[in-house]
Amino acid sequence: GLTAGRVSPETALFPYVTVDKIHESAANTGSKTLLRVDTQDGCHYWEPFNREHDDRFSVSRHLYKNVLGNKICFEEINHDLQLAFRYTWMSSDSYGFVRQCEFHNQGDKSVSVDLLDGLQNILPADTPFSAQTNSSNLVDAYKWSELDEQTGMAFFTLYSGIADRAEPYESLKASTVFCLGLESPTILLCSDQLDGFRRGEPIQQELLKRGVRGAYLVNARLELAPGSSQCWQLVANIQQSQGQAVELRRQLGEPLKVAETITQSVNKGNDRLARIVASADGFQVTAEETVSAHHYANTVFNLLRGGIFDDQYQVSSNDFAGTVKSFNRNLYQRHVVMLEGLPELLNVSQLQSIIKDQADPQLERLGLEYLPITFGRRHGDPSRPWNQFAIRLKDQNGDRLLSYQGNWRDVFQNWEALTFSFPEFIESVIAKFVNASTMDGYNPYRITKEGIDWEVEDPDDPWSYIGYWGDHQIIYLQILLELSNQFHPEELGKLLLRYIFCYANVPFRI
């Protein structure tokens, strides 16, 4: 989510780049921590997680992830200085990305620490993905970073929309970052003073920076008694409107209350994730705790790629009616009275029965392939065009949204596993598979709730192709058919006699 965005790469906190570039840019993108440690032996400079400094101290590094899978902790222990620094990434639906930091004195002597910690290369809101990928230096010229001294909240924006046309083009949203837990820190908006800090020079607060990559770095003095710790948080969010930014600024007038609200929001997300995984039978108890955790992790990864059926076998009539309307407006108009008269929620079998009573094969086709799926949020390396998706969990009003997107191979692999927990949807997955296949036996490379997608071939790009293949067809369909026969032995024979299936129409022929 930090680089792939909360919805899409256009709404990322850090640049969405290939994994090799993520490793190469570790020194100037993402988390950064510099420490000047005063002990009885003198002043020591320590930069956690900087491998170029491995020869300076004896250190141990650890990476932890909670069992739920939604928190990741980076830890470095300096055995020479008897100090430990760790930070944990977690997420809040209301506040965005939360970076919880802890600095611990493991020794038996007091230490004084000059801390500089924060985030580098923060993307402003509304940064176009294509411009950031192909013209990042140009994007830098548009960057405007500003600090609100009263609350310590920084705004990362574009001075204007990025365009080369003689017309007004405003950019009115901001990425925001603020700090909780440190007493009156000095705040930097870019990385220019890092080298000065390394040389022991004092830090000067920055109120406005233009035309450079944004950063949010806090400088504070920590006094740690033996065995004591200091904790703080950096909280970052993207695509904040003017109203949202003003409201956040107002809330930061009571920082303790904000910290408590963030904790509640994170815990609420934990509970929601646990319930989602539980609905797909992700929790089990065995004599081997690691086996149970491994099963849970497999279930989470499956759901992250394929999604989850939203409310067991309950279906939203409004969402189903909207799906019919988006696929076939004429069909929707023919059955608008029936669709609008449906209960707000009904069981999927009840819906299928009502649809059959209409004696309309087109409506029956759309009804059978309807999948009320949400939550799936797969992203991958951006060098693969089929890995880029918009993961929409809410609509423009903030209401829950049923939506899914995935490349063909991944989505049907994961739906296959999902149907073991939701066997009444097996035939719907089969219908989606068959109806999205082409007459010549191939499949499009991406499938979404709105339909199918295929790649537009670029003759000058040897990696580009038409974007659909047939190599995954037979085995996937065979397994789905076997599952149907296992759970519903009579259903396949009935489906073969019904004229409710179709071929996908794509602008290519093999």
Where are these regions (language model features)?
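Anionic coordination/interaction segments
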Residues: 1-510
